[in-house]
Amino acid sequence: EFSRIQVGEGGLLTAGAGALLSRVVNEALKAELSGLESCVGIPGTVGGAVSMDAGTRREWIGQRVRDVVTLRPGEGLHRYEASEIEWGYRCTSIPTSEIVLEATFQLERGQKQAIAEEMEARLRRRRSSQPMGRPCCGSVFRNPPERSAGILIESCGLKGAMAGGAQISEEHANFIVNTGRASAADVVSLMGRAHDAVRDRFDIDLACEVKLLGFGA
């Protein structure tokens, strides 16, 4: 059951890799468990969030992981303690050949109202600067050291640029939104355009934050 969410004793919460991160955050709130407030508003599933160490510059999901279960091709299940995993900026040391099946988070008891207020405050900040009303895959490039990928792309005049049904968000240029009928190829086309523009103008090679499947490097 890849989408199951189970609240255990001692502040533990276990979620299958297919569970939406938004559901996990809400279940933590219902159980009056604090620690995942920084994940509110982040799209995607637990598997993707753990594999990419989703979060912000100051807080990331790996800080709350107790252990992760993966499937090793040809070997079977393997459990990693959080301390065995190297957590980096939008990456982990979990081999890409392994499939994340579930993760257990260590949370703390809190007051439901305080947790909800913190989540709402964070959601307001995201809504004020990110395209929360349209489908997207989150930010598409990693921020270079001491720079903002969104500001770099915006400085190249690409806010609002389109390819098919995909558009570089007019709210935050490091997001590509689906205006209705965007294909993956449309998104990748815009990513390439933004990458090349930033490289040509600033001599900065933006690294992809999203993982591309079925496309060349």
Predicted regions mapped to residue ranges:
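A generic local secondary-structure boundary/capping motif
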Residues: 25-28, 36-40, 50-60, 68, ...
